[in-house]
Curated annotation (Swiss-Prot):
GO terms for cellular component: cytosolic large ribosomal subunit. The keyword Hydrolase does not apply. This is Large ribosomal subunit protein uL6. One of its GO terms (molecular function) is rRNA binding. One of its GO terms (biological process) is cytoplasmic translation. InterPro entries: Ribosomal_uL6-like (IPR000702), Ribosomal_uL6-like_a/b-dom_sf (IPR036789), Ribosomal_uL6_a/b-dom (IPR020040), Ribosomal_uL6_bac-type (IPR019906), Ribosomal_uL6_CS (IPR002358). Keywords: Ribonucleoprotein, Ribosomal protein, RNA-binding, rRNA-binding. Part of the 50S ribosomal subunit. Belongs to the universal ribosomal protein uL6 family. The gene is rplF.
Length: 178
């Protein structure tokens, strides 16, 4: 029994969900998202409630029941409110700059690291040490934020690097001399 899969999704007033074959489409004020769902999972829309049920009880279908419900819930939240990930640059001389459609990071390498803008995502640099990635797809926002973080992930000795806002970096003690 999937506890997440059995929960219903309550739709905001300005969001509509439709299904055509195996493709679920969610439309809202911020845009439109589509995703294919497994044929063993059945989606039912009643008024402003969306519920999911599964045809069989095999392990793969049980695993996808809650996942499908969570994905559609994220789509509903994305088209109504959107998602934002904030990254902080920690380190002497580390900075980010946005020029046109290009994000440039100076994070201690001999060369700057560039990222081009992506469809459906917006990247803002409110100040030189903060990067905000926002969009309607939780997966795409998280993927781009993870790519940016991977350029210089936080190291455990001094804590320098790119980290998510609110992320706690576990610190290590350095070597002790003789």
């Amino acid at each position: 029994m999937s506890r997440i899969g059995n929960k219903t999704i309550t739709l905001p007033a300005d969001v509509t969900v439709s299904q055509e074959g195996a493709v679920v489409t969610v439309k809202g004020p911020k845009g439109e998202l589509s995703r294919e769902i497994v044929s063993a999972i059945t989606m039912t829309v009643e008024g402003n409630e969306v519920s999911f049920s599964r045809d069989s009880d095999d392990s793969k279908t049980r695993a996808l029941h809650g996942t499908t419900r969570a994905n559609v819930a994220n789509m509903v939240e994305g088209v109504s409110e959107g998602f934002t990930k904030t990254l902080k640059l920690v380190g002497v001389g580390y900075r980010a700059a946005k020029s046109g459609s290009k994000l440039t990071l100076s994070v201690g390498y001999s060369h700057p690291v560039d990222f081009e803008d992506r469809e459906e995502l917006s990247v803002e640099v409110p100040d030189a040490l903060t990067i905000k990635v926002s969009g309607i797809s939780k997966q795409k926002v998280g993927d781009l934020a993870a790519e940016i973080r991977a350029v210089r992930s936080p190291e455990p000795y001094k804590g320098k690097g790119i980290r998510y806002e609110g992320e706690v970096v576990r610190r290590k003690e350095g070597k002790t001399g003789k």
